[in-house]
Amino acid sequence: SEYACASGMSFLSTDTKGDVMRNYGTIAKEHYGYQVSVIDLRNPTRSNGNNLLHLVNKYMDLYKENPKELVYKARCEKYAKIISKTIILSGMDAASFGQNAYFYDAAEGLLTATILLVAEFCEPEKRHIVSVFKIIQELLAPSQKKGKNQFQQLMELLPDDHKAKWFAGAALNTAEQSMASVM
């Protein structure tokens, strides 16, 4: 962190305990002029009002207004994928996943698909990461339909060419027990 501060570049630190924020946040702010923000995925009320889905929502809105401008849709999907990868990897190297790589890929796809659905279908005040996690939690509830988990049932409601289905690929073709590991 000290080297990043001294170089003046922007950076992101993962900080599960809050130590980096406590020890370096003040120094970065007071001595190097950094703007320090906290994004707390477990307790969003402790975050600095940063909506992780801002760019996804922005480009989804632009695409809805201009459906022929596929560049907006592509950017929306790109930012959804970046958010998913950032959350799933959380500072780890994907090469270290080994035998579990399938589950991480499926989780990333499921998260990307859910982010896109929230950006497309939720009311503006509900289009944030907390809604994404709430929906995923709700999808963990037992299914009434044998052989189909709730996520698969949700995806069945979408048109065949919907991009969320494409991102969710691996998660859609997994057994119910494996799906619990993905989620």
Describe the predicted segments one by one:
Residues 2-109:
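Switch/coupling segment of Walker-type NTPase motor domains
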Residues 94-183:
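Non-catalytic, charge-rich alpha-helical accessory subdomains
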